[in-house]
């Protein structure tokens, strides 16, 4: 109704922006500056590689998905006040960043397997750098 439209318009007009373009670009640059040492990068890539040859997956993580995973690990490190990404960042983000990027085989899907469970098993199985 017109009354609801007016209410919505008033509510949206009262919402203050939380960031501007310059602020977003600045944070993106800060994320890219977070250091990812070679052992952590290789760890992340081993997890990605395991999705590409997993028997329950028709489609694993793409190169673009791997880059998103890498950037997410950098962003998590920054949010935790660190200038470097750690294996903990990689482990914490594997499922939330990668699960929707996987395509399960029909057999796995109908057998009750989930992308989350596959990623949990991969993360548990890939050796963590020390």
Task: Label the model's feature ranges.
Residues 1-46:
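Conserved AAA+ ATPase core "coupling" helix
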Residues 42-45, 51-130:
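C-terminal engagement/docking regions of AAA+ P-loop ATPases
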């Amino acid at each position: 109704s017109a009354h609801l439209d007016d209410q919505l318009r008033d509510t949206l007009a009262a919402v203050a922006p939380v960031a501007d373009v310059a602020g977003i670009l600045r944070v993106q640059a800060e994320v890219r500056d977070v250091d990812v040492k070679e052992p952590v990068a290789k760890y992340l890539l081993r997890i990605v590689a395991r999705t590409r040859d997993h028997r329950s997956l028709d489609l694993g993580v793409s190169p673009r998905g791997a880059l998103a995973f890498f950037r997410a690990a950098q962003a998590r490190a920054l949010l935790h006040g660190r200038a470097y990404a750690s294996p903990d960042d990689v482990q914490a983000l594997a499922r939330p960043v990668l699960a929707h990027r996987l395509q399960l085989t029909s057999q796995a899907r109908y057998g009750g397997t989930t992308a989350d469970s596959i990623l949990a098993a991969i993360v548990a199985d890939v050796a963590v750098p020390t």
